[in-house]
From Swiss-Prot:
Its EC number is 2.7.7.9. This is Putative UTP--glucose-1-phosphate uridylyltransferase. It catalyses: alpha-D-glucose 1-phosphate + UTP + H(+) = UDP-alpha-D-glucose + diphosphate. GO terms for molecular function: UTP:glucose-1-phosphate uridylyltransferase activity. The keyword Nucleotidyltransferase applies. Disulfide bonds: none annotated. One of its GO terms (biological process) is UDP-alpha-D-glucose metabolic process. Belongs to the UDPGP type 2 family. It comes from the Bacteria. The keyword Transferase applies. It comes from Bacillus subtilis (strain 168). InterPro entries: GalU_uridylyltTrfase_bac/arc, NTP_transferase_dom, Nucleotide-diphossugar_trans. Keywords: Nucleotidyltransferase, Transferase. The gene is ytdA.
């Protein structure tokens, strides 16, 4: 079973400037909880026991959020309001942190988790993407596919043509309903995307991915892309793509973030 997950949270959040100069996108409010709280809840519900958050020097708010605040607890106790904390408890899960000195891409961030993974398969969950499913959590769907096929699996969502340039897009061969054997993957295609199936911020990797990441050189923008590592592994390994059930919200896109807030207000309850 997959028990470890990496959350890469060290980037500058340039798609959400200028607010991300002071507030990490992972801490954007969704109701009374920040984005990353929902993500950690999903991991907990999927059976994850240990999380490694890859952060940078400007992401201390994330660390503070998951830490205890004795001063706040004492204040609430004095006012007989401790129930306010119990209404939205921090998930009971082990969280570790590592500092990424420079924002050098998703692949670089994942490489900081090699020791944490310890030679075992592991999950990667991007904090840009919230996926709410009425049934099985998104990562749980991937873990189920990995358990069956014992190979790396990428979470996919069918995506509108005009939005495909934001994501890695696969070319795949159908294996069963909702599951594809990946033949190619293109990072943020500007034209002629190979399909409408885009990476949805959920991955299960075998430890071999670290060898591929170490062999890569940074791209023209100075970043190491996990898409390139996946593409490089396709000759020697089978990588699957799993269509995920549930509603996806890309927090980096203002239209998605606003839609999430609207959907919450419309239903008058959290989307879970």
């Amino acid at each position: 079973m997959i028990k470890k997950a990496i959350i890469p949270a060290g980037g500058f959040g340039t798609r959400n400037l200028p607010v991300t100069k002071v507030i990490p996108k992972e801490m954007f409010p969704v109701g009374s909880k920040p984005v990353i709280h929902y993500l950690v809840e999903e991991l907990k519900e999927s059976g994850i026991e240990d999380i490694l958050m890859v952060v940078s020097s400007h992401k201390n708010l994330i660390v503070d959020y998951f830490d205890s605040s004795l001063a706040l607890e004492a204040f609430l106790a004095s006012k007989n309001k401790l129930h306010l904390l119990r209404e939205h408890p921090i998930p009971d899960i082990r969280i570790h942190y590592v500092r990424q000195p420079y924002a050098k891409g998703l692949g670089d961030a994942i490489s900081f988790g090699k020791q944490f993974a310890g030679g075992e398969p592991f999950a990667v969950v991007l904090p840009d993407d919230l996926i709410f499913s009425a049934n099985q959590p998104a990562l749980g769907q991937l873990i189920e596919a990995y358990t069956k096929y014992q190979s790396s699996v990428i979470g996919l969502k069918e995506t509108k043509t005009e939005d495909l340039h934001h994501y890695g897009v696969i070319k795949g061969e159908p294996v069963e309903k909702g599951l594809y054997r990946i033949q190619d993957i293109v990072e943020k295609p500007k034209q002629n995307p190979p399909s409408h199936f885009a990476a949805a911020g959920r991955y299960i990797f075998t430890p071999d991915i670290f060898n591929e990441l170490e062999a890569l050189e940074a791209d023209s923008g100075g970043e190491v892309q996990v898409t390139d590592a996946i593409k490089a592994s396709l000759g020697a390994c089978t990588v699957y793509g799993k269509l995920l059930e549930g509603e996806r919200y890309d927090i980096g896109l203002q239209k998605d973030y606003l839609k999430l807030i609207y959907d919450m207000l419309k239903t008058e309850k959290n989307p879970q």
